[in-house]
């Protein structure tokens, strides 16, 4: 099976699980923490066109809409997009455009967005460098890319080497229903990660190099991004059930404005 289709099949199987979890997140402290972080990186302009790249169930698309952005959310998984639309209806929201689309081949005109947000997406892509090129292409001058991710692939490889077990990797004590998080699904996730080239890179240093090569001049890195969340409190049982054994990092990059030639 082609890698992109294999990745799509895996995440589509988990789409209902993600929709339930993200809906809960919209009614938790996590929402306020993410709103604070995103707000601090939005461009200083009245009307902001925002792209949620790898929107999943739409959690961040809804947050950016609350912050006054005109939002488009894309995901390769049609199942994820369907769930994002369902959550939008459940919330009584409207106005967000959710589209099935490949992050590595964006169907948008150049300079269509002022702000591009992504979390836990680049590590899942067969060609993340191409995804960055596409983000740069559709980002308007003065716009910002804000990417949260982690070295998940390397962590999953380590799990496999240490001998992953279902008891260690899957928790049902949180109240979340995780039908897709079986041992078979976890092994499939790890096998996919092992075949993705990005999982052999040193991140976020690799991300910085790619963004700089595209022409980004102002790049900010936070190696301890997770410290902005959970309110300084111990990780809850719900979070333990969704635990990923890798530290979250942030990469923010701003595209230069056009300079007038004399």
Question: What annotation goes with each model-predicted range?
Answer:
Residues 197-215, 221:
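Short alpha-helix
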């Amino acid at each position: 099976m082609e890698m992109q289709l294999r990745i799509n099949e895996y995440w589509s199987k988990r789409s209902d699980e993600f929709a339930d979890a993200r809906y809960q997140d919209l009614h938790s402290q996590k929402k306020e923490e993410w709103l604070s972080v995103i707000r601090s990186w939005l461009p200083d302009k009245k009307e902001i066109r925002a792209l949620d790249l790898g929107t999943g169930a739409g959690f961040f698309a809804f947050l950016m809409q609350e912050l006054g952005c005109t939002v488009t959310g894309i995901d390769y998984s049609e199942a994820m997009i369907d769930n994002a639309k369902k959550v939008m209806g459940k919330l009584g929201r409207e106005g967000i455009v959710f589209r099935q689309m490949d992050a590595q081949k964006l169907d948008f005109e150049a300079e269509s967005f002022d702000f591009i947000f992504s979390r836990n997406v680049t590590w899942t892509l067969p060609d993340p460098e191409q995804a960055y090129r596409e983000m740069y292409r559709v980002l308007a001058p003065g716009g910002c890319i804000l990417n949260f991710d982690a070295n998940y692939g390397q962590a999953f490889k380590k799990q496999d080497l240490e001998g992953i077990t279902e008891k260690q990797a899957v928790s049902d004590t949180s109240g979340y229903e995780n039908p897709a998080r079986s041992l078979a699904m976890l092994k499939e996730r790890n096998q996919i990660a092992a075949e993705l080239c990005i999982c052999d890179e040193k991140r976020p240093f690799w991300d910085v190099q790619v963004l700089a090569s595209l022409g980004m001049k102002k790049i900010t890195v936070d190696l301890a991004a997770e410290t902005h969340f959970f309110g300084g409190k111990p990780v809850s049982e719900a979070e333990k059930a969704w635990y990923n054994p890798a530290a979250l990092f942030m990469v923010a990059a701003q595209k230069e404005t056009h300079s007038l030639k004399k």
